[in-house]
């Protein structure tokens, strides 16, 4: 059905999550948690142009509100990556995580080895840069599906498989 868009594989994002900061909220029904991060990678899918092979620089934050019923998380993540050719790119994604027992287990630390399935976390990713090679990323639409990965003795990693929305 050519009237519907398709997804072209673009890249894989892996972010190591630091300990959450329970900020709270005096004016909302759902408290704010901030999860900082300073380590992670972007790796392009084969054939995707422009290739975005990069590392997170500085400290980014994922601002998260849980729905009052505890079934979903609302994400608003901000960070900066530096590509292999030294370009800086601001990355923002928003999204929703459906909390099943698998997600709850990893996010609470009850599960120390394992991963959640892809399909309970979806995001919309945008980019901003002053670098000529990557400027067209600002004009494209990207979506991702994610999962959480826990390994004993290591930080929890959130992994996204990201694709560009294209005409079929």
Labelled PLM ranges:
Residues 1-168:
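Beta-strand-enriched cores of mature, soluble protein domains
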């Amino acid at each position: 059905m050519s009237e519907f868009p398709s997804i072209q594989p673009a890249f894989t994002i892996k972010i190591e999550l630091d300990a959450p900061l329970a900020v709270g909220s005096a004016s909302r029904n759902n408290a704010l948690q901030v999860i900082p991060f300073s380590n992670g990678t972007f790796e392009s899918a084969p054939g995707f142009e422009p290739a975005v092979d990069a590392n997170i620089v500085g400290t980014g934050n994922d601002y998260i509100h849980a729905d009052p019923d505890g079934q979903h998380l609302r994400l608003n993540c901000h960070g900066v990556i530096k590509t292999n050719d030294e370009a800086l790119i601001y990355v923002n994604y928003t999204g929703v995580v459906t909390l099943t027992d698998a997600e709850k287990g990893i996010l609470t630390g009850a599960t120390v080895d394992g991963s959640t399935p892809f399909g309970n976390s979806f995001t919309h990713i945008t980019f901003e840069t002053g670098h000529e090679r990557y400027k067209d990323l600002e004009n494209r639409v990207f979506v991702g599906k994610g999962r959480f990965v826990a390994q004993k003795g290591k930080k929890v990693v959130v992994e996204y498989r990201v694709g560009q929305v294209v005409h079929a």
